[in-house]
Amino acid sequence: MYHPNMFESHHMFDMTPKSTSDNDLGITGSREDDFETKSGTEVTTENPSGEELQDPSQRPNKKKRYHRHTQRQIQELESFFKECPHPDDKQRKELSRDLNLEPLQVKFWFQNKRTQMKAQSERHENQILKSDNDKLRAENNRYKEALSNATCPNCGGPAAIGEMSFDEQHLRIENARLREEIDRISAIAAKYVGKPLGSSFAPLAIHAPSRSLDLEVGNFGNQTGFVGEMYGTGDILRSVSIPSETDKPIIVELAVAAMEELVRMAQTGDPLWLSTDNSVEILNEEEYFRTFPRGIGPKPLGLRSEASRQSAVVIMNHINLVEILMDVNQWSCVFSGIVSRALTLEVLSTGVAGNYNGALQVMTAEFQVPSPLVPTRENYFVRYCKQHSDGSWAVVDVSLDSLRPSTPILRTRRRPSGCLIQELPNGYSKVTWIEHMEVDDRSVHNMYKPLVQSGLAFGAKRWVATLERQCERLASSMASNIPGDLSVITSPEGRKSMLKLAERMVMSFCSGVGASTAHAWTTMSTTGSDDVRVMTRKSMDDPGRPPGIVLSAATSFWIPVAPKRVFDFLRDENSRKEWDILSNGGMVQEMAHIANGHEPGNCVSLLRVNSGNSSQSNMLILQESCTDASGSYVIYAPVDIVAMNVVLSGGDPDYVALLPSGFAILPDGSVGGGDGNQHQEMVSTTSSGSCGGSLLTVAFQILVDSVPTAKLSLGSVATVNSLIKCTVERIKAAVSCDVGGGA
């Protein structure tokens, strides 16, 4: 369906011969052009073939004569030079006859041209080496300044020399590596000096990384790095300030130590890591503290360790993976189901040599499970990216909470976590992901505790599964060999616009379904059923959302049915009338379809709802369904018919108003590493519960008033509450699992 090389990017020091025009090399109509059009008795410095450089009949004291060639002669000579820079005697004679020139004139012209190309290549090489040298010197000065300003975190006085020895050693190693890189480039450049234009130095030019990988679905995080909508400011993402100058040397030291720990943990097996039944490796905590006695200190009292490791091969180039992880908007976009909000506070280093090698960022982020019953995990950390000597890349996070003693005690701490990325052939990469947290999860709802304590909610398996699915989504969106099946969108522009619209819908849903500290959920307790949480917000001046008062409602419940069965039921348009009250029992037909990988359930669909009492189509629904090893989503939103016609024609999808609703389906954690005892009461009456059930979150968004300044009525809240409860009961009944008030 897609070509495996689609993610191969341009390499910074790729020396592959590349045909380049004169203008690409900086050749313009300057003095050098005038020089190369003169011949006759000029003497050049090049003598690669032992040819004599002067006309033997010319006397040394005789004044030089210059012969300016015609435009036709110059064009013919230039054309021949591109094909053969070193013509033999026979070829020179043929050229002289054709161009009405003396053989010696032709000979000297070619000698001058080769000398000019050699000098130009040397200048190009010198510019590159000078640029690298300047960057190296600037980086060196930055490290020296950080070291000179370092203070002791305990007494506030100047740091002792011995305390900074580790950083100084790292600085020397990094500088030596950069010098070796420059020497290597110099050797390669020297090898190509004097070669034809096809071996030009154009690939050596230093470019800044694009930093904006086109994911075919847009970049919906705003410029500050926040994803989705921001509803509050009294949380860690807003309260944490940028690091002070005295903090920066400590941050650098923490990042370097965390990188070393992450790489060792990624490459070490037993006894540090123990295998589990669900193919995830969990950390042996005793062995960890023996292997890494220093780290970031002992585990705080009251926190529980949670560490896992997972590996996978993904269809994405290693350079693009690094760009996604180091760009807060792309990272939040790809992992929108896990990262509810994220912000880069300060960039301490952008990297060297034009890429992310050595990049250092201070960040805050909020991680979530798609349910209002699971508190989010907020972290203040530094992210460090490094390319290692074997060519692999690593990106590591480590908490900086110790630098903010005035900050309220947090419920989570991030020990060195991140991933090791190794390049594979054909644009693939091997990713080894490590998540190592210390958490206080006592406030998690009992229904979700087995899932959280199994490590499936926030662990490495969920990150890797999400990454695999998103890489497949991107690969499928860029595929050109689309089969012309019924309802399949084959237009590249239409596919791109529809996928972009669908991703905005998914991100909006994910940012509003969890227990983010930015949300002001109100619990509506009712007798004999699940609690429904509601919140309201005003929508104004947003072309992607209808104006007015939006009421959001969400509830989570457990059913003793396998997640795959629930997912297949909810995504199937033929069974939609069994639970969707808004469809009024009408038939639902799929009008358009885009596959997002090899899994049939991963797709974007455009559905048409035919009212039960009319043959006329009166509603369109955009739906994206996605599933992976960690969970599933079915997200949808009503869309305007005229607006969708514009999108399917390749128009801008950002102006299509959406209010997404949908479902998040997670395993209950009672099988494959979870603590099933905590579900004993729920499954005691149902034999199928022993096989593992599903945790289902239902979330609706409804425009209750088109006037943003209007007041919300209690009747609107009651209507939405009734709607969501009726939907829950229909779903339970439809999957033959009506457990009443037992959820």
Curated annotation (Swiss-Prot):
DNA-binding stretch(es), residue numbering of this chain: 62-121
Localization per Swiss-Prot or TrEMBL: Nucleus
GO terms, molecular function: DNA binding; DNA-binding transcription factor activity; DNA-binding transcription factor activity, RNA polymerase II-specific; lipid binding; transcription cis-regulatory region binding
GO CC, alphabetical: nucleus
GO terms of biological process kind: cell differentiation; cotyledon development; epidermal cell differentiation; maintenance of floral organ identity; regulation of seed dormancy process; regulation of seed germination; seed germination
UniProt feature coiled coil, ranges: 110-192
UniProt keyword terms in alphabetical order: Coiled coil, Differentiation, DNA-binding, Homeobox, Nucleus, Transcription, Transcription regulation
Tissue specificity remark: Specifically expressed in the layer 1 (L1) of shoot meristems.
Induction conditions: Stimulated during seed imbibition. Induced by gibberellins (GAs) and repressed by DELLA proteins in an ATML1- and PDF2-dependent manner. Upon seed imbibition, increased GA levels in the epidermis reduce DELLA proteins (e.g. GAI/RGA2, RGA/RGA1/GRS and RGL2/SCL19) abundance and release, in turn, ATML1 and PDF2 which activate LIP1 expression, thus enhancing germination potential.
Basic residues bias: start-end ranges: 60-71
Biased composition (Basic and acidic residues): 30-39
Loss of function: phenotype: Plants missing both PDF2 and ATML1 have reduced levels of L1 box/ gibberellic acid (GA)-regulated putative targets, including LIP1, LIP2, LTP1, FDH and PDF1, in the presence of GA and during seed germination, thus leading to a delayed germination upon imbibition. Double mutants pdf2-1 hdg1-1, pdf2-1 hdg2-3, pdf2-1 hdg5-1 and pdf2-1 hdg12-2 exhibit abnormal flowers with sepaloid petals and carpelloid stamens in association with a reduced expression of APETALA 3 (AP3). In plants missing HDG3, HDG7, HDG11, PDF2 and ATML1, increased cell division leading to cell overproliferation.
Major site of localization recorded for this protein: nucleus
Region feature Disordered, mapped onto this chain: 1-72
START domain span: 244-476
InterPro entries: GLABRA2/ANL2/PDF2/ATML1-like, HD, Homeobox_CS, Homeodomain-like_sf, START-like_dom_sf, START_lipid-bd_dom
Subunit: Interacts with GAI/RGA2, RGA/RGA1/GRS, RGL2/SCL19 and ATML1. Binds to AIL7/PLT7, ANT, BBM and AIL1.
PANTHER family (alphabetical): HOMEOBOX-LEUCINE ZIPPER PROTEIN MERISTEM L1, HOMEOBOX-LEUCINE ZIPPER PROTEIN PROTODERMAL FACTOR 2
Family under the similarity heading: Belongs to the HD-ZIP homeobox family. Class IV subfamily.
Described purpose of this protein according to its UniProt entry: Probable transcription factor that binds to the L1 box DNA sequence 5'-TAAATG[CT]A-3'. Plays a role in maintaining the identity of L1 cells, possibly by interacting with their L1 box or other target-gene promoters; binds to the LIP1 gene promoter and stimulates its expression upon imbibition. Acts as a positive regulator of gibberellins (GAs)-regulated epidermal gene expression (e.g. LIP1, LIP2, LTP1, FDH and PDF1). Functionally redundant to ATML1. Involved, together with HDG proteins (e.g.
Protein name (record): Homeobox-leucine zipper protein PROTODERMAL FACTOR 2
